[in-house]
Amino acid sequence: ETNKKGRTRKDHGAEKRLVVAGFRVVDRGIHAPYTHIPMSESATMDVSDLVKEMGKRAQNAARELAILSTDQKNAALGTLADLLLERSDLILAENRKDLQRAEKNGISGALYDRLKLTPERIRNMAEGVRDVISLPDPVGEEIERLKPRAGLDIRKVRVPLGVVGIIYESRPNVTIDCAILCLKSGNATLLRG
């Protein structure tokens, strides 16, 4: 399949191989070949080197995300919504560990509540993903067209930014919200929450 820029795009199916916000969905598991840096490696890296490396990997992911079709992005989002529900027990178990660490570190009650996931919150997150699927794809949308002189045709078209960095605190649902909006708009994202 060829996109608007004439680049060839391989469609391996959402559940086989699809780049998703810097991650690959492979047989319904998520792997991060672009942005993921193993803990053993990141523990020995200087913070500025770590951030630079993550940025490089995100830029590589951004190139692939920018050329995904609407169907590919929506399929990936659908897979994410399904996985949130299918793996909610695992997500809740990991969240309990986060909550225990937060308590040991003396987190405030308000931050604790924001960090805490419940089955209902996970269902709401999955529903939010499905809501984004129903939104029109902004990539390639013509937002303005001018013909000032004979032969000139000027168009303003929405394109992905590339890599979006977002910093927030203690909100697992914000992780999903940011990732899905960046994916829908064809952008890679670096999240710090």
What are these regions, as identified by a protein language model?
Residues 2-11:
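Extreme N-terminal basic, low-complexity initiation segments
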Residues 13, 32-37:
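Short hydrophobic alpha-helical segments enriched in small aliphatic residues
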Residues 25-27:
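Short, strongly patterned local motifs
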Residues 38-153:
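N-terminal Rossmann-like NAD(P)+-binding subdomain of aldehyde/semialdehyde dehydrogenases
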Residues 134, 138-193:
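Conserved small-residue-rich beta-alpha loop and adjacent elements
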